[in-house]
C-alpha cells in the first residue's frame, strides 16, 4: 500500500470515467488527474486506500505521443468541462470509441464480431481552426467560503 505524500513514478495505462489517468505501481492502482495514456509521470500520493489511491501530477517525465503542449482552452484544468484536453483530438476520438466498444463487450456482453459489423467509427467535430473544442457545454466551477 502507498503512503500519503509518497512520490512515485507511474506509467499511465488507461483513463478513468472522470478523465483521470490510471497507472499501477507494484500492483497498486493510482488515479492521476491530467495524465493521459502513454505518459510516464512523477506523482504525489494524496489519498491512499487499501487497493487504490489518488495522486497529483507533479511532472511529466516522458510525455505520451498523444500529449499536446497546452490544452486549447485556458480554463481546461480549472472548469472540469474537458477532462482529456491534454490529449490530441484524434487520440481522444480513438479513446472514446475504444471505451464504448469495451463497455459494450464487457458490460453489455455484445460479441466483438457483432460490434465489428454494426459499430461505426466515432464521428468527430470539424477540425478546421478550433472547431473540435467549441461544442462543449459543461463547466464545473467550485466555490467555497
Role assignments for model-derived ranges:
Residues 1-145:
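SAM-dependent transferase fold signal centered on methyltransferase-like domains
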